[in-house]
UniProtKB/Swiss-Prot annotation:
ATP binds at Y57, K96, D500, G537. This is Phosphoribosylformylglycinamidine synthase subunit PurL. Substrate binds at S99, H100, N101, H102, R121, Q245, E317, S318, Q319, S540. Part of the phosphoribosylformylglycinamidine synthase complex involved in the purines biosynthetic pathway. Catalyzes the ATP-dependent conversion of formylglycinamide ribonucleotide (FGAR) and glutamine to yield formylglycinamidine ribonucleotide (FGAM) and glutamate. The FGAM synthase complex is composed of three subunits. PurQ produces an ammonia molecule by converting glutamine to glutamate. PurL transfers the ammonia molecule to FGAR to form FGAM in an ATP-dependent manner. It is an enzyme of class 6 (ligase). Its EC number is 6.3.5.3. Monomer. Part of the FGAM synthase complex composed of 1 PurL, 1 PurQ and 2 PurS subunits. Keywords: ATP-binding, Cytoplasm, Ligase, Magnesium, Metal-binding, Nucleotide-binding, Purine biosynthesis. Pathway: Purine metabolism; IMP biosynthesis via de novo pathway; 5-amino-1-(5-phospho-D-ribosyl)imidazole from N(2)-formyl-N(1)-(5-phospho-D-ribosyl)glycinamide: step 1/2. Mg(2+) 2 binds at D122, D273.
Length: 739
């Protein structure tokens, strides 16, 4: 029980207690001006979380405004729990990606698990049924015992939550680089389906309507989680372990069903997840978005610990809780609905007209703050930006092609690089078939999930090559979006829209802010050219350990529409005799490549270049060919270059190989990472029809020899590799490193 006396308003100011909560002197002065008096301890807490970068985006808003956020299919853009895109037939797809990086660095199992739980709540709070989960993970090198521990625990946490709740984890990506050693990135994405008339908003309309708290009880976990996520990790972060929340997937499963049932009733006015900043953000945001106020009686909050103060209740980030507004007089039916699922639903306040958030506890008013001041009026900072010193140096480097002596050994070594190697060790822990809608399981370019009751499906992917973005943030930003779209197209989908998770270092450092600005410029341009608007996302700053920032990692989560299940395409070769085509030119581009990192132990120079108009044209041609039934397999050429893409297409097949002839200098032809390229196979009898639609070069054919042989133009053999040997190297790499 906490008997600690809270400091009074004068002490808060004189002893600068607000600074410990993350507020600056200027911000505290603004609060004093807004209120016309000094704030008390609880009110200072409300402002400190709502004005943190994590909740207010005060450092990133000017940059985020550059994203294109509208389109003919967009039903809901940024600003609600998740974005929504129309997919026809009165149906829509709802999706969002969020980070849980800081909690996962401290307490990896619960950090990752509650990241999954939180993103699921964002989806069903919109009225949608969650149908798929994905993730994008970054770790240091697996040789480090600490990294092994983080990797194993994060994957176990994602699996533990997703498997228990019964939503399939259908895809994702995992990359390894030394810069993530002390600060892993854990980005979780959830996708849901909804009928247009069921869309709900997090808005508290109707004065006199009742504010209800539903779900799990409130404890002291996660207090100041939003503030913790707005500072750099350090040795003292370990002491902040209590700030990591604990998840209960079985409770959340019940919460999903109860909320989706409630959404079908006309008693519900508005609903929002209690995520970052818990009760504070949900109440202030719902009131502010509706232009209303809210009064809450905190004695009625279900509490699982004794003696909790208003400050603790308002700032707790306990999991599996929602705030709802219901029509006055309908409270009892809501209570009964939740009781049926064994969940609490408690009336704890009402909507008012005066735009104030008022909190009462033990008969006294303990806070009175304008809702807009918390939700909308955080100061916006235009941070200084300065080109990173390394950028000019990398741009001026004369790039040489790495010297490779043995092409086969190099290919086998690349297949064992953890970023390229099979992630089966990861996804075998996930239930990716639950609910039986998964058409394409993890391991191909994109996951594909059918839309029940139709012939349609969703193609879903997460992508980001942060090495390219480090070398050249603007070009790398373009590539991140383009690669996501490439993966969707290779799976037979038409790219619809993206959600993003912008993971960066400390924005107060001008060179980091420059990375943020430039990568968003690149992403925005790619989104416009490829017609994939940004419908929501998340910003995670301060990803640094001991002053070293992670690579700039703006992860892209993209959803595409497969108009007919018969268009679904995968990367593995299908039958001997099929012709192999390469779309796109190969240049000697090795900056940020797997080959460069493997040979030199670091990355440098220029990232691969990209022409977005060319990218868009190629994607359109390939999608047309797939929809016309002319394509057997399609795979985008990414890390490791053409040799790896061809190897992966053979590894995924059974008993098939390939014989291929590549033009140009051998090392570049095999391993360069030029953009906008695809490996496509076509039935011989469809050669003419395919070549009418698609500009591509035929480079060889699929064989039944179980070997991949690659020749140069003079017909000299560059490499011959047995497919079983390649599969063993590729599949065994990560388990071997974990021993």
């Amino acid at each position: 029980m906490s008997l600690m006396l809270e400091p009074n308003p004068t002490q808060i100011k004189e002893e600068r207690i607000y600074a410990e909560m993350g507020l600056t002197d200027e911000e505290f002065a603004m609060i004093e001006k807004i209120l016309g008096r000094l704030p008390n301890y609880t009110e200072t807490g409300l402002f400190s979380v709502m004005w943190s970068e994590h909740c207010s985006y005060k450092n990133s808003k000017p940059v985020l405004r550059k994203f294109p956020t509208t389109g003919e299919r967009v039903l809901q853009g940024p600003g609600e729990g998740a974005g929504i895109v129309d997919i026809g037939d009165n149906q829509a797809v709802v999706f969002k990606m969020e980070s849980h990086n800081h909690p996962s660095a401290i307490e990896p199992y619960q950090g990752a698990a509650t990241g999954v739980g939180g993103i699921i709540r964002d989806i069903f709070s919109m009225g949608a049924r969650p149908v798929a989960l994905l993730n994008s993970l970054r770790f240091g090198e697996l040789q480090s015992p600490r990294v092994k521990y983080l990797f194993e625990e994060v994957v176990a946490g994602i699996a533990g939550y997703g498997n228990c709740i019964g939503i399939p984890t259908v895809g994702g990506e995992v990359q390894f680089d030394p810069c993530y050693e002390g600060n892993p990135l854990v980005n979780a994405m959830c996708v849901g389906l909804i009928h247009h008339e069921d869309i709900k908003k997090g808005q508290a309309h109707g004065a006199g309507n009742t504010v209800m708290y539903v779900g799990a009880s409130t404890g002291r976990d996660g207090i100041h989680g939003a503030t913790f996520a707005s500072e750099e990790l350090s040795e003292s972060s370990e002491a902040k372990r209590p700030a990591v929340q604990v998840g209960d997937p079985f409770m959340e499963k019940l919460l999903i069903e109860a909320c989706l049932e409630l959404i079908q009733s006309d008693a519900l006015v508005g609903i929002q997840d209690m995520g970052a900043a818990g009760l504070t953000s949900s109440s202030a945001e719902m009131a502010s978005k509706a232009g209303m106020g809210i009064e809450m009686y905190l004695d009625d909050v279900p509490q699982r610990e004794t003696g909790m103060t208003p400050y603790e209740m308002m700032l707790s980030e306990s999991q599996e809780r929602m705030l709802i507004v219901v029509k006055k007089g309908r409270e009892q039916e809501v209570v009964e609905l939740f009781e049926k699922y064994g969940l609490a639903a408690v009336a704890m306040g009402k909507v008012t007209e005066d735009k104030m958030l008022r909190l009462f506890h033990k008969g006294e008013m303990v806070a009175e703050v304008p809702a807009d001041a918390l939700a909308e009026e955080a100061p916006i900072y235009h941070k200084p930006s300065k080109e990173a010193a390394y950028f000019r140096e990398f741009q001026e480097m004369k790039m040489k092609t790495p010297k490779v002596d043995n092409y086969k050994e190099t290919l086998l070594a690349l297949l064992q690089q953890p970023t390229i190697a099979s992630k089966e060790w990861v996804y075998d822990q996930y239930d990716y078939q639950v609910r039986t809608s998964t058409v394409v399981t993890p391991g191909s370019d994109a996951a594909v999930v059918r839309v029940r009751g139709t012939e349609k499906a969703l193609a879903i992917t997460t992508d980001c090559n942060s090495r390219y973005i480090y070398l050249d943030p603007e070009t790398g930003g373009k590539i991140a979006v383009a690669e996501a779209a490439r993966n969707i197209v290779c799976s037979g989908g038409e790219p619809l829209a993206i959600t993003d998770c912008l993971n960066f270092g400390n924005p107060e450092k001008p060179e980091i802010f420059w990375q943020i600005e430039k990568s968003v410029d690149g992403m925005s341009e790619a989104c416009r050219t490829l017609q994939t608007p940004v419908i929501g996302g998340n910003v995670s700053m301060y990803n640094e350990r001991s002053g070293e920032a992670v690579y700039p990692t703006p992860t892209v989560g993209m959803v595409g529409l497969v108009h007919d299940l018969k268009h679904v395409t995968t990367q593995e070769f299908k039958q001997a005799g099929d012709l192999i085509y390469v779309m796109g030119e190969t240049k000697a581009e090795f900056g940020g490549s797997e080959l460069q990192k493997m040979m030199y132990g670091k990355i440098f120079g220029q990232s691969p270049s990209i022409d977005l108009e060319v990218e868009a044209k190629r994607q359109k041609q390939l999608l047309e060919a797939i929809q016309a039934g002319l394509v057997q397999s399609a795979h985008d050429v990414a890390e490791g270059g053409l040799a790896v893409a061809i190897a992966e297409s053979a590894i995924g097949a059974k008993g098939l190989g390939a014989t291929v002839k590549l033009a140009g200098e051998a090392t570049a032809a095999l391993f360069a990472e030029s953009q906008s390229r695809f490996v496509v196979t076509v039935k011989r009898e469809q050669q003419e029809a395919f070549e009418k639609v698609v500009e591509a070069i035929q480079v060889g054919e699929v064989t039944n020899t179980n070997e991949v042989t690659i020749h140069n133009e003079e017909n000299e053999v560059l490499l011959t590799a047995n497919v079983d040997e390649m599969r063993k190297a590729w599949k065994g790499a990560i388990p071997c490193l974990l021993k």
